[in-house]
């Protein structure tokens, strides 16, 4: 399924903190969505971390906290600072350090930014990073990530009222999968009927899709006008 990376894989020596994971995900995302402003300045990177859309959970981190996260990621060779600009700019080295192809890196970035998602949701949410041909393609790369040693993702137990399994990244460390199963069982005992729950989830997905299309339109218009999208609070 995947192609062999250009260099041998190198494993992170420890689990990432939540802010480190957010920083890494933002760098991978913005590399594709706003290539004209990538590598990112500290200000743009912080704005990307604090986005109110396409983020779960929403964060409110300071530039100082982002700098600490950058330093931690530098120590793992996952991020490095460019030297061709007077303003410090940062870029990721995710593909090579983790030893994964661009398709897998796109999936990991989206899991870092948006939390657990189904294969169908990942296919939709990664479209600007990589256009997967179908859901089976997404699942193929997810399976590879799950079979990696150590594993980079895990398939979660299907929650009550859900038709598909969700996937979660493990770059922040191992998780207790049984706790997710217990949470799903507890959800089944709640007063919200499965059909109503599914309707609410469908509405949420529809709203998320609309927001993504609007974001893409704003970024395109900003690019045409020569405006940095991050300056608009994207």
UniProtKB/Swiss-Prot annotation:
InterPro entries cross-referenced by the UniProt entry: DUF480, WH-like_DNA-bd_sf, WH_DNA-bd_sf
Q: Which Pfam families match?
A: DUF480
What the record says about family reads: Belongs to the UPF0502 family.
By what name is this protein known? UPF0502 protein Reut_B4455
